[in-house]
């Protein structure tokens, strides 16, 4: 089954590169979609976030995240060096502004995978950013995905479900919605959207 669009708007073919932001509720499959997209098309540039979270086994500085302490993160915020930032589970995460702007200036399409709070901040600071909402096929499917992980306590799952309802209600704030019925299909649709924003030709494969 193909991924489906809701609320698309035609974009002129000569449009300059625009920042593409992918957001959606927890459990909808954002990371899976992005990972698949970058496996098939490694030329897609995904912004690496800065975080105060401690590295997990196998994670490398500058690859999964830029790992910084609280003092360094405070400086990034104070100096306006973050395009957006948010706190989650006691740790802070933020998108370095300069790296994103440098890539856009070079004419490259840029992808951010962030939460609703971050997407709203990006919209405020970069009004021409293209916000893409990744939605589940149904609420029941999202509940199944969140409860099927089997790695979290019931109270955490309840908090995630409550947050998901708030995030789903914010869908109308986004420029376009992709329904995640298939990782392969929705990755292809996301790539097509990014290329459409930059005026590039589609990439087959």
Swiss-Prot record:
It comes from the Bacteria. PROSITE patterns: GUANYLATE_KINASE_1 (PS00856), GUANYLATE_KINASE_2 (PS50052). It catalyses: GMP + ATP = GDP + ADP. Keywords: ATP-binding, Cytoplasm, Kinase, Nucleotide-binding, Transferase. Pfam families: Guanylate_kin. One of its GO terms (cellular component) is cytosol. The keyword Zinc does not apply. Signal peptide: none annotated. It is found in: Cytoplasm. It is an enzyme of class 2 (transferase). CDD domains: GMPK. ATP binds at residues 24-31. GO terms for molecular function: ATP binding; guanylate kinase activity. InterPro entries: GK/Ca_channel_bsu, Guanylate_kin-like_dom, Guanylate_kinase, Guanylate_kinase_CS, P-loop_NTPase. The keyword Protease does not apply. Residues 17-195 form the Guanylate kinase-like domain. Its EC number is 2.7.4.8. NCBIfam families: guanyl_kin (TIGR03263). PANTHER family: GUANYLATE KINASE, GUANYLATE KINASE-RELATED. Belongs to the guanylate kinase family. Essential for recycling GMP and indirectly, cGMP. This is Guanylate kinase. It comes from Streptomyces kasugaensis. The lineage of its organism: Bacteria, Bacillati, Actinomycetota, Actinomycetes, Kitasatosporales. The gene is gmk.
